[in-house]
Amino acid sequence: MSLEDDVIAIIVEQLGVDPKEVNENSSFIEDLNADSLDLTELIMTLEEKFAFEISEEDAEKLRTVGDVFTYIKKRQAEQ
């Protein structure tokens, strides 16, 4: 599985959405109907999966699925 597939699988599981609804441009709040608790749980799951901490400041910037793809790729390149 690619990074994108892994992230989408986590989003689908955590938010209970249809995989067809999830794409790079999907907004967590507007398109996927996530609330703040959903987003907190999603961030925690991403941290566990990819083995790094996401600061609260960085987490607030992750508004779309594409933002998460970009952030994780950047963090992996830094490791």
UniProtKB/Swiss-Prot annotation:
* Cellular location(s): Cytoplasm
Which residues does this entry mark as bearing O-(pantetheine 4'-phosphoryl)serine?
36
Report the main location listed first in the record.
Answer: cytoplasm
The yes or no answer to whether the keyword Cytoplasm is present is yes
Supply one GO BP term: lipid A biosynthetic process
What Gene Ontology molecular-function terms does this entry list?
acyl binding; acyl carrier activity
- What's the PTM story here? 4'-phosphopantetheine is transferred from CoA to a specific serine of apo-ACP by AcpS. This modification is essential for activity because fatty acids are bound in thioester linkage to the sulfhydryl of the prosthetic group.
InterPro entries xrefs: ACP (IPR003231), ACP-like_sf (IPR036736), PP-bd_ACP (IPR009081), Ppantetheine_attach_site (IPR006162)
The biological pathway it contributes to is:
Lipid metabolism; fatty acid biosynthesis
Any one GO cellular component localisation term in the record: membrane
Which segment of the chain is annotated as a signal peptide? none
Task: Indicate the segments forming the Carrier domain, all copies.
Answer: 1-76
Q: Which Pfam families match?
A: PP-binding
Top-level taxon: Bacteria
Entry keywords, A to Z: Cytoplasm, Fatty acid biosynthesis, Fatty acid metabolism, Lipid biosynthesis, Lipid metabolism, Phosphopantetheine, Phosphoprotein
Its biological purpose is as follows:
Carrier of the growing fatty acid chain in fatty acid biosynthesis.
Give the UniProt family note. Answer: Belongs to the acyl carrier protein (ACP) family.
What is the recorded name of this protein?
Acyl carrier protein
What gene codes for this chain?
Answer: acpP
